[in-house]
Amino acid sequence: MERKMKAEIAVMTAENIDRKAIARGGEILKNGGLVAFPTETVYGLGGNALDPKASMKIYAAKGRPSDNPLIVHIADIRDLDKIVTEVPEKARVLAEKYWPGPLTMILPKADIVPKETTGGLDSVAVRFPSDRIAQELILAAGGYVAAPSANTSGRPSPTTAGHVAEDLGEAIDMIIDGGQVNIGLESTIVDFTEDIPVVLRPGYISLEMLRETLGDVRIDRKSVV
């Protein structure tokens, strides 16, 4: 039986970023590979968000159903308009307050985003993380990285690179070890495709914080967290 290769590991901090390793990670992502990396919430399992084959690799590595949408990570607010067709005013207000940060917004997707990335939906989940390592990697990869949590489905979301290596070390190409994440709690997901914003997943940004900014907000009780 063919022996699986262990992921390449690069260690760095937000204060001392390894530019060569970031460039290497960016090339892996551009070429359809998978790179795990730190964000302020949990470690993400990254693939090129605009490459349908890369998105399918993410589903396979996680053992995740392919109809479960992936979150697209950006590192420049100006890149949002390329992957969505509309940004409601309330979404822009929330982004101004909480981006970069642990907020994911669901918006109508542009044609450039493949259905494999969105789980077949006409909307796309987008986040602008505040972690500097994540931002540098996303930019090196071309600006759009699909990244759910870097764990096999059903396991806890990883807060260290060691967790990722133990779980996915033989299924992915590279792990960027940025140490312990700052928050350790998933991003809050808010759907802006309806008239009233809907919280699909509670997270670091609380319902009270959202209502302070948006006013009326609903919670989807049926949503799978």
Question: Which sequence ranges carry the predicted segments?
Answer:
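Active-site-adjacent structural elements in enzyme catalytic cores
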Residues: 2-225
